[in-house]
Amino acid sequence: MNRSENLFFSGSSLASQVHAAAINGDKGALHRLIIGNSALKDKEDQFGRTPLMYCVLADRLDCADALLKAGADVNKTDHSQRTALHLAAQKGNYRFMKLLLTRRANWMQKDLEEMTPLHLATRHKSPKCLALLLKFMAPGEVDTQDKNKQTALHWSAYYNNPEHVKLLIKHDSNIGIPDVEGKIPLHWAANHKDPSAVHTVRCILDAAPTESLLNWQDYEGRTPLHFAVADGNVTVVDVLTSYESCNITSYDNLFRTPLHWAALLGHAQIVHLLLERNKSGTIPSDSQGATPLHYAAQSNFAETVKVFLKHPSVKDDSDLEGRTSFMWAAGKGSDDVLRTMLSLKSDIDINMADKYGGTALHAAALSGHVSTVKLLLENNAQVDATDVMKHTPLFRACEMGHKDVIQTLIKGGARVDLVDQDGHSLLHWAALGGNADVCQILIENKINPNVQDYAGRTPLQCAAYGGYINCMAVLMENNADPNIQDKEGRTALHWSCNNGYLDAIKLLLDFAAFPNQMENNEERYTPLDYALLGERHEVIQFMLEHGALSIAAIQDIAAFKIQAVYKGYKVRKAFRDRKNLLMKHEQLRKDAAAKKREEENKRREAEQQKGRLSPDSCRPQALPCLPNTQTDSHKQSRAPSKQPPSSEAAQDPDKRACRGGPGRVSPSRAPQKEQHLSPDVQGTVPRKPNESPREQCKGRSACVHFSPSEGSDGKRHPGVSSVEKSRSETGGEQRCDKGKGFLKQPSCLRVAGPGDEGEDPGWAAASLPQQDGHRKPSRRQDTASKAKCTSQKRRVQELRGGRHSPAGSSRPGSAKGEVVHAGPNALQHRTPRNKTTQDKLAGGIYSDLPQNTEVLRSGVRKSGTSTLSEDAQVSKETDPAPGPLSGQSVNIDLLPVELRLQIIQKERSRKELFRKKNKAAAVIQRAWRSYQLRKHLSHLLHMKELGARDVDRWNRECLALLLQVWRKDLELTPPKTTAVTRTTKSLSKGSSGAKSTRHSVLKQIYGCSQEGKVPHSTRSSRTHSVLHLNSVSNLQCIHLLENSGRSKNFSYNLQSATPPKTKTKLRPSLEEECVRGSWNS
């Protein structure tokens, strides 16, 4: 020991002085201490060692001899159960071992590791100590085993001491005893990297060169050749394989032969040696079907691979999954091996696929070896080869997130628009792996971020499933829609709530994700329901704060709305049934009236036939209403209409029928618009007292014939109308002021046709009979006129196509034709119309008529005659408001189809222009009012942000704005009648708040897209304040008090996030008065 230790022992207790004297070799001090106290000779220190042990450690032979003579115990053990003989054998001290053995030391004593002094003696190169111990041992004690069941021969082979091995074998030591791992001494001798270990191996093999000894397998199936190959000891391998009984192709427990081990570790020389001494000629494979060439290829040992490929017995066979050694090399990035194989094997198939369809490029892309991918692409590897999952190498790279490989493949021509068998795109696999950079690269290469697979899932949903926030942010920044639903109705928010990713939920809501989207299945779960099922308390609280609803809450709201809609449906259905019933009664009444008119016309025709037989009644009278009559006679013809009918006419039914029918009211009771009309203009069809002029027009069957007439000289004169022919078709007689009889006015006048040229336009004066001329129509003329009128009626029906316009139709051309009065009374009409409208009709509609209808225009625009001016003067005197021109309108069914369409189109365009002008004016006025109100509201908000000191003034401004909005609403909104009477108190308290609450809650449920709006583009949470300002500037006055009474609608929190509260509010009484006032109005 050193000096400090000596001082320590000498300066402590008495026992320490004895140990110190033994270490220092102070024999005198040791003798004095032992004489003074005999117990000190075996005194133990803190390690349990006696002075004799310290004498062995310090090599104090004389002190040890003195202690043994004084009676010290030679077999005393320390705390490790080792005696002085153990220590002497461990140090290899031959003199102490001899001294102790002569003093009968126990050579079979075992320490805590169950090792005897014989085990410890094998550590030293000198065999003297081992030979000394073997002299004292019996023949069976040499194979004593330690705790690991190893004998002294195991330790000698381990320490590579061939002399010890020979000595132990000479003393009958067993060379076939396995230790705890199943290894025999030959395993330990072969498991040595020193080439000199071959001597130990030879010593053991020389003792028993048996096949069992050479091919002994430990508990893991490894032979001594496996260990020799593992250490790369070529000499030992050469010695072992030199024996013919050595099995080169023996398997271990993993079905790997020594050749597999040599290929895996890259020992090319050993590989060559084993291939040469392999007598079987076959290359075995392991449990996965991999050959030693696979092992060499994946480890990038090009020299070893070259040795394999040059040997004729080696073939590049596939493993159990169909992968060759070339694929193994590509998967491990063994570029040197790939180049070697491509150079040595010209027939190698670079695009060969395994049983799953994967190629070498698939394996390289999956592992992320950029250099390998480039090497394969340079050697014409197929860049878009697909496996059984329809995955290309680019899919494998996107799944693992290898950016460099992805860019290399895209530059090499890989397609980015492919999908696999499940419809997953490259972006789906990148999102499933959470690779945000890869997602950005793919989006830059024109991949749609909203692409859906066959289940309807988007890449954003895949990223939300894993909670990859960075990937989700990249997708939504590139316009990924967070509200897209898959086929089951789930969105990205459903997946985030299901897995409890709060940060992902916040990100989705910041990008305008709809929190109340429902599934398509029977449960109809919302994202909040997923959070409730998973008991995600933080997510539940956050979703409720942002207006999320469960399916139970949505069903309650839907039930409320359905009830309201059903009530409205019942009211509308009752109204519709009532309306249909009234219309049915009205139609029956009209049918009865038409039937009655038809019977009256038949009766009147019979009376006319009787009247023709009498010569007095058939005498023609003067026609004061025709254009050629004098002004005085025209004025006098109006006089009888202003006088009440005589008693004779009231009593005689035949006379009453000739004056216009039995139901004709007196001029004193008729409206003013009918009192000024003469009997000539009012027509011949009788009308009931309660029948309107429109209904009377429907009952007529008047017509206009556009055809030339034939004169007395045999020539065809334009517009010559035979009175005899027309008298047979008249439906009644009109009274004239000068004539004492009745004047039969024809209801159908013949108008000049297109073939008449060069005739006088004033044909009416020449063709119609004068007052003093009397002509009696012959029977042949009556028959001819009847036939012509019948054919004309048939032609009218053909032109109409059998269609009858409904009563009261406002469609142009839907009214039935009327009589064209060629006289001055034709300017008179039944209903009043201003002069502007009259001019428009005269110049607009009738300007489109052809030249052959000049008679129709002359009745409207003939200003040269004095008769027309006098008629207009009389019309002003009798009726201050001139009537419309429908009284002189032609039968539009007789006009050509093209002309009718032009008239209808012109009328429609005029109405459409008028409607557009009104709509534009309303839009301009509404926009100006909205601008003023928004300007006022912005001013108030600016005052509030600046912290206005005068709070009362700000309140007054707010109240003024509120009243202004309320006044506008009252002016624009018509009063609505409610079917159910309510009290003023209930309306003022509940109605406005309930309306606004239902509107906002439905908006939360169905979102903005359900209101007919275009979905907003994804935007950050910073834009929410701008949207809130826009919503505040809305002109719906109900929204200003949206929060009033909202919490009373439901017992749970269903409303959306309320707007931030201001410091100053309107007084509750003022708000209630405003609401009450709006409902009362």
From Swiss-Prot:
Chain intervals with Polar residues compositional bias: 638-649, 863-872, 1051-1061
Ranges for domain IQ: 555-584, 917-946
GO cellular component labels: cilium; cytoplasm; membrane; microtubule; nucleus; spindle
Positions of ANK repeats: 13-42, 47-76, 80-110, 113-144, 148-177, 181-213, 220-250, 254-283, 288-317, 321-350, 356-385, 389-418, 422-451, 455-484, 488-517, 523-553, 1022-1050
Keyword Hydrolase on entry: no
Motif D-box 1 per record, residues: 490-498
PTM characteristics: May be ubiquitinated via its interaction with APC2. Hydroxylated at Asn-75, most probably by HIF1AN.
Membrane-topology descriptor: Peripheral membrane protein
InterPro entries: Ankyrin_rpt (IPR002110), Ankyrin_rpt-contain_sf (IPR036770), IQ_motif_EF-hand-BS (IPR000048)
Secretion signal span: none
Modified residues (3-hydroxyasparagine): 75
GO MF term set: calmodulin binding
Gene Ontology BP terms: kidney development; negative regulation of canonical Wnt signaling pathway; protein localization to ciliary inversin compartment; Wnt signaling pathway
Entry text on domains: The D-box 1 (destruction box 1) mediates the interaction with APC2, and may act as a recognition signal for degradation via the ubiquitin-proteasome pathway.
Subunit details: Binds calmodulin via its IQ domains. Interacts with APC2. Interacts with alpha-, beta-, and gamma-catenin. Interacts with N-cadherin (CDH2). Interacts with NPHP1. Interacts with DVL1, PRICKLE (PRICKLE1 or PRICKLE2) and Strabismus (VANGL1 or VANGL2). Component of a complex containing at least ANKS6, INVS, NEK8 and NPHP3. ANKS6 may organize complex assembly by linking INVS and NPHP3 to NEK8 and INVS may target the complex to the proximal ciliary axoneme. Interacts with IQCB1; the interaction likely requires additional interactors. Interacts with microtubules.
Role summary: Required for normal renal development and establishment of left-right axis. Probably acts as a molecular switch between different Wnt signaling pathways. Inhibits the canonical Wnt pathway by targeting cytoplasmic disheveled (DVL1) for degradation by the ubiquitin-proteasome. This suggests that it is required in renal development to oppose the repression of terminal differentiation of tubular epithelial cells by Wnt signaling. Involved in the organization of apical junctions in kidney cells together with NPHP1, NPHP4 and RPGRIP1L/NPHP8. Does not seem to be strictly required for ciliogenesis.
Protein name, per record: Inversin
Native organism: Canis lupus familiaris
Lineage, top ranks: Eukaryota, Metazoa, Chordata, Craniata, Vertebrata
Gene: INVS
